[in-house]
Amino acid sequence: MLSPVEVDLEAYDISRVSGFLPDKCPLRKLPDPYYVPWERLTAHLEPLIRAKRLQHELDQMPVLGITRLTSQPMRRRAYVLLSFLAQAYLWGEDIPNTTLPQAIAKPLTEVSTLLEIKPFATFAAFCLWSFSVHFDDDIGGDCHKFLDNMSMTCSFTGTTDEAWFFNVSTAIEARGGRIIPSILNAISAVQNNDMLTVEGFLLDFTICLRDLCDLIDRMHENCRPSVFYHRIRPFLSGTSNNNPATENSKGVFYVQAEDGTGEWHRYSGGSNAQSSLIQLFDITLGINHDIGYKTRYLREMRSYMPAQHRRFLARMEEISNLRPYALSHGPGSSNMCSLYNSAVLGLKNLRDKHMALVFRYIIIPRAKEKAGNGLAIRQKDLVGTGGTDMIPFLRETRDDTMNAVHLPYS
């Protein structure tokens, strides 16, 4: 078995300075004029949606091939464009569409196959591959400066609220990603029984988690709950059984040929559960989500991640060793127990912050909407964009994290 220090992050498409984010800005525009139809329509999503002309324009769009996408950055840009066009087509009218036209479905399926990712709008489309800053050095720099200077390369609504919502998640990826090399060093230190290095890592990890909580706390600065709930969130929807708009259908039909043939597909909507970073934190601390549906859901969300990132998570599961090492140290022998507990509590606090966002941006606006219509909120109304029953899932994953804190403090 390879030593953890020999894990080649570059082979897993992971940056030492920005983690799962590319350490250079994604393309803002495809350089080949052949792809102008994709770029032009994506650049005008908001006015076309507002005028209810988007579906008509996309129905007239030519079917473009992907052979001119000769680099990974170009393929990622194409995937982002087509994902935004697909979501706008499906959810941009008063009545959701259940058919995706060939001009979107065919190239989206083909480029997704090359990228080894679902042919649907994922966390990667919304955050990892669609941000922009003026200078690449900002990506690995101060996370708050990165957040303040970031912009989106695509938008459904053209609002600051939408940009800020996605940018906060992207800034979390940038700040959290910097801890990945330290995780590998800590795993190696465990193998060498280097307690000081492990303790130093746990302290740094706790600080990192605190920084991520601070970033979440900034969501309210530029993202209003009413705008998120009514204007942004619909475009994050999936086509799974838990989506009321598609629960009585087979999902969405992807037209693949001029004769109208194709296939039905069901996919979960874009969700932070598709962030490789948070699952990596669970793996690092040995957090066990042992109830069947949670494990199945989190595993399913890995299939929505970029291929190399999910392979990295599988590799980390093989070599992760921090929790048993912490368990092996009694409170009188070192600070290991208290430092490990502090890191676990830091992850628990991060989940608390996320749950508070869900209440503020989804549960409360939905309750107000229901009350305005003289209706009571029901459990089926509390389904997340990823297709889960939000509150039970978030509470249980938070409680799973808290349950890991059973080591005695020194």
Swiss-Prot record:
<dbReference type="GO" id="GO:0020037">
    <property type="term" value="F:heme binding"/>
</dbReference>
<dbReference type="GO" id="GO:0005737">
    <property type="term" value="C:cytoplasm"/>
</dbReference>
<keyword id="KW-0223">Dioxygenase</keyword>
<keyword id="KW-0479">Metal-binding</keyword>
<dbReference type="GO" id="GO:0033754">
    <property type="term" value="F:indoleamine 2,3-dioxygenase activity"/>
</dbReference>
<comment type="similarity">
    <text>Belongs to the indoleamine 2,3-dioxygenase family.</text>
</comment>
<feature type="binding site" description="proximal binding residue">
    <location>
        <position position="309"/>
    </location>
    <ligand>
        <name>heme</name>
    </ligand>
</feature>
<comment type="pathway">
    <text>Secondary metabolite biosynthesis.</text>
</comment>
<keyword id="KW-0349">Heme</keyword>
<dbReference type="InterPro" id="IPR037217">
    <property type="entry name" value="Trp/Indoleamine_2_3_dOase-like"/>
</dbReference>
<keyword id="KW-0560">Oxidoreductase</keyword>
<protein>
    <recommendedName>
        <fullName>Indoleamine 2,3-dioxygenase nanC</fullName>
        <ecNumber>1.13.11.52</ecNumber>
    </recommendedName>
</protein>
<dbReference type="GO" id="GO:0034354">
    <property type="term" value="P:'de novo' NAD biosynthetic process from L-tryptophan"/>
</dbReference>
<dbReference type="GO" id="GO:0019441">
    <property type="term" value="P:L-tryptophan catabolic process to kynurenine"/>
</dbReference>
<comment type="function">
    <text>Indoleamine 2,3-dioxygenase; part of the gene cluster that mediates the biosynthesis of the benzazepine alkaloid nanangelenin A which contains an unprecedented 3,4-dihydro-1-benzazepine-2,5-dione-N-prenyl-N-acetoxy-anthranilamide scaffold. The first step of nanangelenin biosynthesis is catalyzed by the indoleamine 2,3-dioxygenase nanC which produces N-formyl-kynurenine through the catabolism of tryptophan. The two-module NRPS nanA then utilizes anthranilate (Ant) and L-kynurenine (L-Kyn) to assemble the dipeptide product nanangelenin B.</text>
</comment>
<keyword id="KW-0408">Iron</keyword>
<dbReference type="InterPro" id="IPR000898">
    <property type="entry name" value="Indolamine_dOase"/>
</dbReference>
<dbReference type="Pfam" id="PF01231">
    <property type="entry name" value="IDO"/>
</dbReference>
<dbReference type="GO" id="GO:0046872">
    <property type="term" value="F:metal ion binding"/>
</dbReference>
